[in-house]
């Protein structure tokens, strides 16, 4: 029990301010230690009964707060349920910390209940994997407090490392007794442990030979500076990054360069609409009277762009000089043709005015294509719905986007915008845990300014498959903190809308000659869910919109009245209509 108190005390001293707990017997020492810490105001807790949802809740909290957030669970498959969130955390550089209880290691392979080999369960998806071994076993902790604290420091430093940070895992074998004799004794022990560390820290401050607490100096970057010759036709492509502030600094240096930015990137000074990216792959464009070279000579990649096939086509062109910039060791080089890698830039020269004119014209064409494509409001699709949401965004809003169609539709709607932070789980681009991520993100967003009269708004946008995949994210107990102002826009097209525009959605692949459904069965995957009833079961407010006008009205009303917890705004849209909209936007009506 004392080991749990030591570990939790050090986690808080190392920057933890929120923690997600899952019920279990083996993790009792950790859970009770966290409850005591919350009782005295040191941390805020969130309890969830589903470990997968819990891990994504912690991911959302950590993604927005940029602080390490532990998720605590018992042994066995409970730990395995954290794998999807750990994959996303490590690929996105988010400090998610899995704190798993375990049986003593001597029991592994003995047939003991709820015992699996979980020490290395996350493999390369954990940036740091540690095990307390026998240090946390009852009777050993009294003399092992210093070693336990060192393990926590190492764990948190690894998770929050600006270059190599991400998901981290501490496995904690524990042996009975797992609970204190009384809660009063628990509080007494916690006070003694904290006081002893306070005294040691104070004494260490006067002892030049004592180890000091690690401090963060100026941000280190993995790569050096790259010179960018702006006299060449240059296009910047900005994708998802670990540190938005770093990306912003790069984009400020390249402010005069045409930039295609994904919704989760900072807003560029010279935006180029993503709908027009394909035109940059054409060597010369002519209207019969005038012609212009539209292919760039060089591309500067910031972070990891993954959304647009037109961008992928450009990056595959080996005749274009590609400069890849990253603030982590992960470098985007899908086609093995990156010419230079860096973390900062030194621009020289200026962009040719003729190139800037071409880029503006191409971007305007993209904007007009989208505007014309959405001018007709029938069929009403998710693309229309996301455009309405984009128009309704205000300074200070946080936008959480589903990783499938929602983030792509947001790009069509013109994001990113100044004053609006957008996030999406694009590390592994899975739809897992999107509701839970949004709930965590919304609470961290509101917690950033606890003095605000009204909680800032978080809007999450996702399709029905993404929503249904994480319904458990709405399962928030009556004793738990919950978002004050979260609007979830659920675009319900009864199935997988993204496949309508991919190769499996071709007309000749939809149905066999005998009428057997191919596309609809395994790609369309229609749902028959009553989302109003589902929301009612979780005690969540549900609203419905069936047109552009209704959707805009409900969003405006929600903004004016203010949030009252979680509201799900279901938008009934057409799935087959997406093909028609895509053709309109592409100009091939």
Swiss-Prot record:
Which Pfam family is one of this chain's hits? TPP_enzyme_C
* InterPro entries, A to Z: MenaQ_synth_MenD, THDP-binding, Thiamin_PyroP_enz_TPP-bd_dom, TPP_enzyme_TPP-bd
The protein's matches in CDD domains, at most eight in alphabetical order, are given as: TPP_PYR_MenD, TPP_SHCHC_synthase
- Under the GO molecular function aspect, what terms does this record hold? 2-succinyl-5-enolpyruvyl-6-hydroxy-3-cyclohexene-1-carboxylic-acid synthase activity; magnesium ion binding; manganese ion binding; thiamine pyrophosphate binding
Q: Quick one: a GO biological-process term for this protein?
A: menaquinone biosynthetic process
Assembly mode: Homodimer.
Protein role: Catalyzes the thiamine diphosphate-dependent decarboxylation of 2-oxoglutarate and the subsequent addition of the resulting succinic semialdehyde-thiamine pyrophosphate anion to isochorismate to yield 2-succinyl-5-enolpyruvyl-6-hydroxy-3-cyclohexene-1-carboxylate (SEPHCHC).
What the record says about family reads: Belongs to the TPP enzyme family. MenD subfamily.
Protein name as it appears in the record: 2-succinyl-5-enolpyruvyl-6-hydroxy-3-cyclohexene-1-carboxylate synthase
């Amino acid at each position: 029990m004392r080991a749990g108190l030591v570990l939790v005390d050090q986690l808080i001293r190392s920057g933890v301010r929120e923690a997600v707990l899952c019920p279990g017997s083996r993790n009792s020492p950790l859970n009770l230690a966290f409850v005591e810490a919350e009782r005295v105001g040191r941390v805020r807790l969130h309890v969830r009964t589903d470990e997968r949802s819990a891990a994504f809740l912690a991911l959302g909290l950590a993604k927005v707060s940029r602080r390490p957030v532990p998720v605590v669970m018992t042994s066995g498959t409970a730990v395995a349920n954290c794998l999807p969130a750990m994959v996303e955390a490590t690929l996105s550089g988010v400090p998610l910390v899995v704190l798993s209880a375990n049986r003593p290691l001597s029991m592994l392979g003995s047939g003991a209940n709820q015992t699996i080999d979980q020490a290395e369960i996350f493999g390369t998806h954990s940036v740091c994997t540690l095990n307390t071994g026998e240090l946390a076993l009852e009777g050993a902790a009294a003399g092992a407090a210093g070693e336990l604290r060192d393990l926590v420091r190492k764990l948190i430093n690894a998770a929050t490392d600006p270059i190599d940070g991400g998901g981290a895992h501490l496995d904690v074998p524990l042996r009975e007794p797992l609970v204190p004799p009384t809660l009063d004794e628990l509080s007494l022990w916690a006070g003694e442990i904290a006081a002893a560390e306070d005294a040691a820290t104070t004494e260490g401050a006067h002892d030049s030979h004592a180890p000091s607490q690690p401090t963060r100096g100026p941000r280190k970057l993995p790569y050096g500076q790259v010179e960018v010759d702006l006299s060449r036709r240059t296009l910047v492509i900005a994708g998802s990054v670990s540190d938005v502030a770093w990306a912003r600094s790069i984009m400020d240096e390249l402010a005069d360069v045409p930039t295609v930015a994904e919704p989760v990137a900072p807003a560029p000074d010279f935006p180029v609409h993503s709908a027009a990216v394909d035109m940059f792959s054409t060597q010369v464009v002519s209207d019969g009277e005038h012609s212009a070279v539209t292919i760039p000579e060089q591309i500067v990649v910031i972070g990891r762009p993954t959304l647009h096939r037109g961008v992928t086509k450009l990056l595959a062109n080996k005749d274009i000089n590609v400069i890849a910039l990253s603030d982590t060791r992960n470098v985007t080089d899908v086609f093995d043709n990156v010419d230079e890698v860096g973390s900062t830039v030194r621009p020289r020269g200026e962009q040719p005015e003729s190139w800037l004119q071409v880029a503006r014209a191409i971007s305007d064409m993209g904007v007009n294509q989208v505007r014309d494509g959405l001018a007709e409001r029938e069929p009403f699709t998710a693309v229309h719905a996301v455009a309405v949401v984009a128009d309704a965004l205000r300074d200070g809003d946080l936008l959480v986007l589903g990783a499938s169609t929602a983030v792509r539709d947001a790009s069509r709607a013109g994001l990113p915008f100044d004053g609006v932070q957008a996030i999406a789980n694009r590390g592994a681009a899975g739809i897992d845990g999107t509701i839970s991520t949004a709930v965590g993100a919304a609470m961290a967003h509101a917690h950033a300014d606890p003095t605000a009269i009204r909680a800032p708004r978080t809007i999450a946008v996702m399709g029905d498959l993404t929503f249904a995949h994480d319904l458990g994210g709405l399962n928030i107990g009556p004793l738990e903190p919950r978002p004050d102002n979260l609007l979830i826009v659920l675009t319900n097209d009864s199935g997988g809308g993204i496949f309508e525009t991919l190769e499996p959605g071709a007309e000749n692949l939809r149905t066999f000659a005998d009428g057997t459904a191919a596309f609809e069965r395994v790609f369309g995957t229609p749902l028959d869910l009553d989302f109003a009833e589902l929301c009612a079961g979780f005690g969540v407010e549900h609203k419905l919109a069936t047109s552009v006008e209704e959707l805009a009205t409900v969003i405006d009303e929600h903004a004016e009245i203010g949030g009252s917890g979680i509201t799900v705004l279901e938008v009934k849209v057409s799935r087959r209509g997406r093909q028609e909209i895509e053709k309109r936007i592409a100009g091939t009506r």
